[in-house]
């Protein structure tokens, strides 16, 4: 999402293992810009991130919609028949359910992140493991892409919010499509009825 939103700009991405860690990093460094998944066609609203955003002092400065496409990637010279585990984020595993059903030899192993799964396989030289991740992550970590487009729903999108500290939020030029959007948070008393 960051590469798509800031297309053509020279950016440095900083990896955070969890969304709470992302919000913590943003609260410690006002010069950072965050990209936070907020909803997905299949998984729905990511309520944890709504709450993290509400509790932060960050401002929404833009959004990016991204079609989710997964690949099956493994170490070079590995074939799909040699694989025993498919490592990925639980939602990505869910998004590739039909593919995984066609390959019952692949034990699903939940990890914290799709790209992190690819990184772990590459760095630890994990034979027999495959990552379900994006094509960019597979290429970045030198994995061989065995199959592309393994996601069940080809119309699966995730909407990301671009968030920043108010100190720098005004410096970020909003995209045309973001100019007419508002986000409102309100609470109601929790009573019967």
Predicted regions mapped to residue ranges:
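Domain-level signature for soluble enzymes in the chorismate/prephenate branch of the shikimate pathway
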Residues: 1-193
């Amino acid at each position: 999402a960051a590469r798509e939103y800031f297309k053509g700009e020279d950016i440095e991405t900083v990896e955070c293992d969890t969304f709470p860690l992302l919000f913590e990093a943003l609260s410690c460094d006002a010069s950072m810009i965050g990209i936070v998944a907020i909803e997905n066609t299949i998984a729905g609203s990511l309520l944890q991130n709504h709450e993290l955003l509400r509790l932060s002092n960050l401002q929404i400065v833009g959004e990016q919609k991204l079609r989710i496409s997964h690949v099956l990637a493994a170490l070079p010279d590995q074939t799909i028949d040699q694989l025993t585990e498919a490592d990925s984020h639980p939602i990505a595993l869910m998004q590739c359910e039909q593919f995984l059903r066609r390959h019952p030899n692949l034990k699903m192993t939940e990890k914290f992140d799709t790209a992190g799964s690819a990184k772990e396989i590459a760095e630890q030289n994990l034979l027999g493991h495959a990552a379900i991740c994006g094509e960019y992550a597979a290429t970045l970590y030198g994995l061989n892409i065995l199959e592309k487009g393994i996601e069940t729903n080809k119309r699966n999108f995730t909407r990301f919010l671009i968030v920043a500290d108010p100190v720098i939020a005004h410096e970020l030029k909003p995209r045309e499509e973001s100019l007419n959007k508002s986000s409102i948070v309100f609470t109601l008393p929790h009573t019967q009825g």
